[in-house]
Amino acid sequence: MTKAQNVDPSEIKKFEEMASRWWDLEGEFKPLHQINPLRLNYVLEKADGVFGKKVLDVGCGGGILAESMAKEGAVVTGLDMGKEPLEVARLHALEAGTKLTYIQSTIEDHAAENAGTYDVVTCMEMLEHVPDPLSVIRSCAALVKPSGHVFFSTLNRNMKSYLFAIVGAEKLLRIVPEGTHDHEKFIKPAEMMKMIDQTDLTEMGITGLHYNPLNDSYKLGRNVDVNYIVHTTKY
């Protein structure tokens, strides 16, 4: 597989079609807005803040996490292959008066030219949308500086995650559009650790992300059966 091939055109098309609603707090991306404070605080805590640090957000989409890190004083670059989401991200940042840079590129191409550039790399809800997640993880490892931090989040692959993320979230509760996820592309934590072990990253911790349908809220916890976040550092 060449670098240019680690993109699923159907995945890009899917998010291109929803791009104009990226910042609609009650739209298809409502869950991302709901979990963003949790993701942001986790990154801030584990990376000892991001103020003044160079941060790369891989698969940034419309810029929800990227913009929030920029507001914390980070020098942020958002990377995505979707043209429409990036245009939405740039416009929203302009309207919000937030300074950051957005680039349309694969992470593999970006890593080839920017190795060892970033203090922090985030790759949230992205690995399950690409053909070769190991290639993305290797590129993240290449992009971060020694002693820097890399964060990955994705979904576990088991019957519970199928019932919660596919049947529940897509088909019954309609929290996200049907077809957003492919359960076969979900990644078990053991598979994630095996891929991380093939790089010069060291796993520092893993936490679960839990949804409560009774009060429509999320929280972090130890159970990683469905959504989870992994914190790594480069040695």
Curated annotation (Swiss-Prot):
GO biological-process terms attached to the record: methylation
Is Lipoprotein one of the keywords UniProt gives this record? Answer: no
SUPFAM superfamilies attached to this UniProt entry: S-adenosyl-L-methionine-dependent methyltransferases (SSF53335)
Key words of the record? Methyltransferase, S-adenosyl-L-methionine, Transferase, Ubiquinone biosynthesis
Per UniProt, the enzyme's principal EC class comes to transferase
Which residues does the annotation say bind S-adenosyl-L-methionine?
A: R39, G59, D80, M124
Q: Does the keyword Transferase apply?
A: yes
> Pfam families, alphabetically?
Methyltransf_23
Any idea of its EC number?
2.1.1.222, 2.1.1.64
Q: What biological function has been recorded for the protein in this entry?
A: O-methyltransferase that catalyzes the 2 O-methylation steps in the ubiquinone biosynthetic pathway.
* Assigned protein family: Belongs to the methyltransferase superfamily. UbiG/COQ3 family.
Q: What is this protein called?
A: Ubiquinone biosynthesis O-methyltransferase
Q: What gene is behind this protein?
A: ubiG
